[in-house]
Structures are given as structure tokens and as C-alpha cells.
Regions:
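Acidic-glycine-rich active-site phosphate/pyrophosphate-binding loop
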Residues: 48, 55-57, 135-140, 228-242
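Conserved core of the sugar-phosphate nucleotidyltransferase
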Residues: 102-193
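N-terminal glycine-rich phosphate-binding loop and ensuing alpha1 helix
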Residues: 1-53
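Short aromatic/basic micro-patch
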Residues: 21, 102, 159, 178, ...
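RNase H-like, Mg2+-dependent phosphodiesterase core
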Residues: 74, 79-84, 210, 217-253
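SAM-dependent methyltransferases
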Residues: 1, 5, 139, 185, ...
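Short phosphate-binding loop-to-helix
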Residues: 59-92
Length: 253
């Protein structure tokens, strides 16, 4: 399940985050292209905001079930789970935020591998910065420190037993916190695995530019040449342009 039904309010753009493009691909397509490399994934569900129906259609996605999102993340997730739980032969589900397109295939494979032995698998990374809690917002100098030893950030994709996470969403909507794992941890044991710093969430345009820079660093540019014999009675094309000449290439360039 790829969640892409938010309003992207903090991103501040006429085009929502899911449809922003890097190297010619939207964030939706980047996420899907990575996930489709794994044969274990039998169905793909994209949860979208109904106001973006035209944008979704323009992507011309293949083999992807489109589900309209709800008024919040929990309702959007439940809408997708409600569809998936009625599909035959599916017992596990991965739930992923479209705003985290930079997960590696190594992390994805690790999540799938751990799901063989656990009912919930979630990537996490340690908090390394100093943490402070403000006691009085009007007097920010009064703060208390928080020990970092037991603090960490969770990431997506997050994997679950399908029936269990569906039941929890359906029966605990009023208790919903921030992500799916916070709901699951109240009742079940969770396997945490090492996440990736590069799997950051795109919240604002600065995050997006950071991601764009990462993709630029992966690109390679080179210069090459080709040789063709020139013969009479043929047109000369270079880079697709017809060049006036008495000779033309015995080939295409």
C-alpha cells in the first residue's frame, strides 16, 4: 500500500508531493518501480486524494489498484486494507508513505525476509542529536533533557500481518496516533530492523531538493563518438538533423 492521499500543505506547491518529478518520474512511480522488482509483492494499491484524480490518471499506472483516500492517514490506510483483506491468498501487507521514495532495495528485501518470522517489521534509526523538552513554551530556557538511548525514528515501509493490522485500524480509529506501528505496538510485539538515513521523509521543498541532489549524484555523463563511411546518393543525418551534403552516411547517426 502506497499512501499518497495527503494535502501536502507543508510542501506549498500547486502540485502535490506524490506528483513531483525527479529524473522524469513522479514520487509515485519511483516508489512503484522499486517495489515491482520483488516477486513476493502480489498486489499494489495506491491511495490517492480524489482532488488529484486527473493527475493519477495521467500516470497511466499498470497493475495498480487505485483507492480513494479518507480525511486522514488512518482512514486512508483503512480504505486500502478494507479492499486488500477481501483478496484471496494475501496474508501480509507493507504500508509505505509516498514521501519516502529513497529506500533501498536492500532495506525492502530485509523487511520481506524478517516477515517470515514476525508479524510486524519496522525499520528504525537511532536519534543522535541532543533532545530537549520544553516545560513552559513562554520560557523556553526551562527545558529538561531526554536520554537518547531509547529514542529512535521509525520509517516506512512497515510490514504487518494483514488481518491483525486491519482489525486494529477498524476497531481503534479513535486511538490512532501517528503511523501504523504506533497502533500495533499497543497490542503486539514488533521486530525493529536497522533503517537508513537516506530514507528520509520529504516534508518541504528543501527535503525535495536534497533528494534531487542525491539523484543527480547517481547520474553519469560521458562523451563518445561513432564512425560511418560516407557514400554518394544518401542523405546525411547528424543527431537527427538533415545536413546538406553530396555524401551521406552508410548508416544512421
Amino acid at each position: 500500500i502506497i499512501l499518497a492521499a495527503g494535502n501536502s500543505q507543508r510542501f506549498r506547491s500547486n502540485i502535490g508531493k506524490p506528483y513531483q518529478k525527479i529524473a522524469g518520474k513522479s514520487l509515485i512511480e519511483i516508489n512503484l518501480n522499486k517495489a515491482t522488482k520483488f516477486r513476493q509483492i502480489k498486489k499494489f494499491i495506491l491511495v490517492y486524494n480524489k482532488k488529484d484524480a486527473k493527475r493519477v490518471k495521467s500516470l497511466k499506472l499498470k497493475n495498480v489498484k487505485l483507492v480513494v483516500g479518507g480525511k486522514n492517514r488512518q482512514q486512508s490506510t483503512l480504505n486500502a486494507l478494507s479492499y486488500l483483506v477481501n483478496q484471496k491468498g494475501i496474508s501480509k501487507v507493507l504500508i509505505h508513505d509516498v514521501a519516502r521514495p529513497n529506500f533501498s532495495t536492500k532495506l525492502f528485501a530485509s523487511i520481506l525476509s524478517n516477515m517470515r518470522n514476525y508479524r510486524a517489521v519496522v525499520p528504525k534509526i537511532k536519534v543522535q542529536d541532543a533532545i530537549k523538552q520544553v516545560i513552559d513554551s513562554s520560557k523556553e530556557e526551562y527545558v529538561i533533557g531526554k536520554k537518547r538511548d531509547n529514542l529512535f525514528f521509525t520509517q516506512t515501509p512497515q510490514a504487518f500481518n494483514l488481518k491483525e493490522i486491519y482489525y486494529l485500524h477498524k476497531t481503534n480509529s479513535g486511538k490512532y496516533k501517528d503511523d501504523d506501528i504506533s497502533l500495533y505496538m499497543d497490542l503486539n510485539k514488533v521486530k525493529f530492523i536497522e533503517g537508513e538515513k537516506s530514507n528520509f521523509k520529504i516534508t518541504d521543498k528543501l527535503d525535495f531538493e536534497n533528494l534531487r541532489d542525491i539523484y543527480k549524484s547517481k547520474q553519469s555523463v560521458g562523451i563518445g563518438f561513432d564512425v560511418h563511411r560516407l557514400v554518394p546518393k544518401r542523405k546525411l543525418y547528424l543527431a537527427g538533423l538533415n545536413i546538406k551534403s553530396k555524401l551521406g552516411t552508410l548508416g544512421h547517426s
